[in-house]
A protein has these predicted regions:
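P-loop (Walker A) phosphate-binding loop of NTP-binding proteins
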Residues: 12-14
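Conserved phosphate-donor/acceptor-positioning beta-strand/loop module used by diverse small-molecule
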Residues: 99-104, 113-137, 168-169
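Post-Walker A helix-loop "phosphate-sensing" segment adjacent to the P-loop in P-loop NTPases
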Residues: 28-36
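ATP-dependent small-molecule kinase phosphotransfer cores
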Residues: 38-99, 105-109
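NTP-dependent small-molecule kinase module
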Residues: 158-206
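Conserved lysine of the Walker
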Residues: 19
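Post-Walker A alpha-helix
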Residues: 22-23
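Extreme N-terminal, non-catalytic leader segments
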Residues: 1-8, 31
Length: 206
């Protein structure tokens, strides 16, 4: 990984784009990176661990954190609250470590306002049909919830041009390699301003 000064990398994506899997692989391959664990009020899934995947708290505790200014950003998604602890991020950066923050586009917008020096990355699926397949393959949601998530995801994807970089998660190995390149300061091919990338996105965002 790069020896560049510590940066905060904000990674967002529509539901089902493979963001969580990409971030997991990135962290496994680069143990020097720090993962910012977010707070949430949603129910813990069977495979999740408190303090590793999220800090699971009730609504009252979440609102206390928000009121006390302890959250760098917060958002409400599908009726659940999500937020990033400010002190955790700042401590990692002060130690000289890159920090990876996995959130939604709303939270990313707030983080950019609070920390303009952050690097923002948006993950896209290769096609709408692939997004729908991935959501169904999770096996955790009803058809009604999947339909709602798909509709929400389509709206989320319209915000891609707010981000510094865009990665299309078609091939997992290629996508994580592109993510590593961005963190390493060598991801120019994935800049959202790239004409070649914009042309590629036209076929996805129709």
């Amino acid at each position: 990984m790069s020896s560049n000064p510590a940066r905060l990398f904000v990674i967002a994506a529509p539901s089902g784009a493979g963001k969580t899997t990409l971030v997991k692989l990135l962290l496994e391959r680069n143990p020097g990176l720090e993962f910012s664990v977010s707070y949430t009020t949603r129910e813990k899934r069977k495979t999740e661990v408190d303090g590793r995947d999220y800090f699971f708290v009730d609504k009252e505790r979440f609102l206390e954190l928000k009121e006390d200014g302890e959250l760098l950003e917060s958002a409400q998604v599908f009726g659940n609250h999500y937020g990033t602890g400010r002190s955790q991020v700042e401590q990692h950066l002060e130690k000289g470590n890159h920090v990876i923050l996995e959130i939604d586009w709303q939270g990313a917008r707030q983080v950019r306002e609070s920390m303009p020096d952050c690097v923002s990355i948006f993950i896209l699926p290769p096609a709408r049909e692939e997004l729908e397949r991935r959501l169904k393959d999770r096996g955790t949601d009803s058809d009604e919830v999947i339909a709602r998530r798909l509709q929400e995801a389509e709206g989320d994807m319209t915000h891609w041009d707010e981000f510094d970089f865009v990665i299309v998660n078609d091939d997992l190995d290629i996508a994580v390699g592109e993510l590593e390149a961005v963190v390493d300061g060598k991801g120019d091919a994935n800049r959202s301003s790239s004409p070649e990338l914009r042309q590629k996105l036209e076929s996805i965002l129709v």
